[in-house]
Amino acid sequence: MGYDVTRFQGEVDEDLLCPICSGVLEEPVRAPHCEHAFCNACITQWFAQQQICPVDRTVVTLAHLRPVPRIMRNMLSKLQISCDNAGFGCTATLRLDQLQSHLKDCEHNPKRPVTCEEGCGLEMPKDEMPNHNCIKHLRSVVQQQQTKIADLEKTAAEHKHQLAEQKRDIQLLKAYMRAIRSANPNLQNLEESIEYNEILEWVNSLQPARVTRWGGMISTPDAVLQAVIKRSLIDSGCPLSIVNDLIENAHERNWPQGLATLETRQMNRRYYENYVAKRIPGKQAVVVMACENQHMGEDMILEPGLVMIFAHGVEEIL
């Protein structure tokens, strides 16, 4: 529907009026042959009833419509119009092409979003503020949160039950596998081969690393740091069968003779450059796997590997 003519200053050219609603053209389009112009909404509604021009009755369809000429758009944009919110106290008169941007910020707009300053902080249309009740709103929020918490607790209980069932299934499966292995030693060899291939695949997915500050090694990481490194190992795809072993081997109490004490590490530091190390993603830590370090002496490596954590100095080899 077009704009009410009474909102405009001065006379409006008849060519700028919609023949259907008699208002000033809004989002105007024109018929291609007769060139009569209409509001887009008006002509769309008209075509829902009949496929002819409402002025000269020539055949025309929605697909035939075209934008109006630039000169008509320029004439429309220069018209001076009063604000939609004049009835609410706005006295602004502005160009038609500036109306929409003005309406977004017009302080007299009854639907302009405002924030309650009485404590609840709810954002609502300005005309709803007089009937707003903070306590009622907050009570509704609390009820919604309680419902959401109840749903989450129900979901968590279901997941816990499913996890317990899965753990029982795993234990039964492990017992079954042990029974089969005891009856067929070849199956145990096959399982070990599969596990070894999984370890190799994971190790090959890690980025090669270089340690530039061996003196920054943290040889006695606390439980929190070990938990952080363990999470990173799991996230990187480390086979679960070796995660705990690697974390056990992150502390000097489990290290081989060549790394066991600070004095020994200082004496052997020149050999550490021979380690094939892979970076634990996102951490100042490396994993030194036995399968990649067979060239190192037995006093320098452990099965399945070592985790070395540093304060700084771990770089990826690109």
Curated annotation (Swiss-Prot):
It catalyses: S-ubiquitinyl-[E2 ubiquitin-conjugating enzyme]-L-cysteine + [acceptor protein]-L-lysine = [E2 ubiquitin-conjugating enzyme]-L-cysteine + N(6)-ubiquitinyl-[acceptor protein]-L-lysine. One of its GO terms (cellular component) is endoplasmic reticulum tubular network. Pathway: Protein modification; protein ubiquitination. It is an enzyme of class 2 (transferase). Keywords: Metal-binding, Transferase, Ubl conjugation pathway, Zinc, Zinc-finger. GO terms for molecular function: ubiquitin protein ligase activity; ubiquitin-protein transferase activity; zinc ion binding. GO terms for biological process: extrinsic apoptotic signaling pathway; melanocyte differentiation; protein polyubiquitination. Its EC number is 2.3.2.27. It holds the Pfam family USP8_interact. A zinc finger (RING-type) spans 18-57. InterPro entries: NRDP1, NRDP1_C, Znf_RING, Znf_RING/FYVE/PHD, Znf_RING_CS, Znf_SIAH. A zinc finger (SIAH-type) spans 78-138. PANTHER family: RECEPTOR-ASSOCIATED FACTOR, PUTATIVE-RELATED, TNF RECEPTOR ASSOCIATED FACTOR. Acts as E3 ubiquitin-protein ligase and regulates the degradation of target proteins. This is E3 ubiquitin-protein ligase NRDP1. It comes from Danio rerio (Zebrafish). The gene is rnf41.
